[in-house]
Amino acid sequence: YSYSTLLALSDHIKDEMKQQGVLITDSTVSTDISEKVFQSAIPKTVTGRQLTSWRKGSQGRVNQSTKPSSRSQSIAVVGMAGQFPEAGDVEVFWENIAQGKNCISEIPKKRWDIDKYYQKGEAVAGKTYSKWMGALEGYDLFDPLFFNISPIEAESMDPQQRLFLEACWHTIEHAGYNPHVLSGSKCGVYVGCAYGDYQMLSREEQLSAQGFTGGSTSILPARISYFLNLQGPCISIDTACSSSLVAIANACDGLVSGSIDSALAGGINVMAGPDMHIKAAQSGMLSPDGKCHT
C-alpha cells in the first residue's frame, strides 16, 4: 500500500534486491537473478531433529532425519490465461499495463443499476459513495455442455466457477498441451477466491442442490480437477487481497517438495451484484473518484 504505482513498486523491488547484493542492470532482469533470489530463500539442507515421545511418559527418542530434496528448485511457467477489465486475454492485459491504461469505469447498467445505490458524499446505510469498478465483459457467457455440465446446473454456478474452468482450460492449451493428457497426473489446483454474491440474486438458487455446489468456494477448484481427472490437491484459499499470491506460493511449495508434478494456480474475483460493493463502501475502502490515492 506504500507504493501506489507500478513504477514506485518497481523501484522499491530494485532497492530491496540491491540490499540483498543482487546486481540490477537497466536491461531486462535475467532468469539467473530471479533464480538466485529464489534459492537464497530456501535452505539447501534440512538438519535432522530429535522428537520426544509423549506416550505413557516414555523418554524414548525418535531420530527424524530429512534428506535434502533432489528435485530442482527452478519452476517454469509454461502457460498463462485470464480475463481482466478491458482485456479479454493476457496479451491485451499486458498492453494495458505497458501503456498505463486506466481500466476502471463506471459500473455498467447490465451489471446492476448503480443509480439505485449511489449517493455522493459520506457513506449512508445501504448506499455506496463510489460508482466505479473494473468490470469484465461477457463474464456471464459460458458453454456448460463443453464441460459436461447441464444448463440447469450452470445457471446456479457462480460466474467465478465458470471463469476459472475456462481459464484453466485455456492455460493448458496455451502451454501447448491437450488438457486431457493430464488425466491421472499429479497436477494440483490452487485458487485464490472468496465467497461470491451471485446466489444472493436468487433465493430459489440459494435453496437448491445446484446452488449448494454452485456457490461453494471449495467446489471451485474441484470442478477442473474432476473434469480432467487430476490427482493432485485442489485447494481454494481466501487470504483477502493476497489470495492469488498465496495460491501460487502453495503451488510452488508443492512442486519443490515433490508432492505434485505440475500445477494450475491463480485467482478469481467477480462481483455479480451490488452487495459487496456497498459493504466495501460502508467500510470506507472505495475511492469516490475511482482512483487510488494511497
Predicted region positions:
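Glycine-/small-residue-rich "gating" segment that lines the acyl/pantetheine channel
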Residues: 106-107, 218-225, 246-254, 262, ...
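Phosphopantetheine-dependent thiolation modules in NRPS/PKS and related acyl-activating systems
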Residues: 1-58
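Active-site nucleophile and cofactor-binding loops and adjacent substrate-binding regions
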Residues: 1-2, 97, 109, 157-160, ...
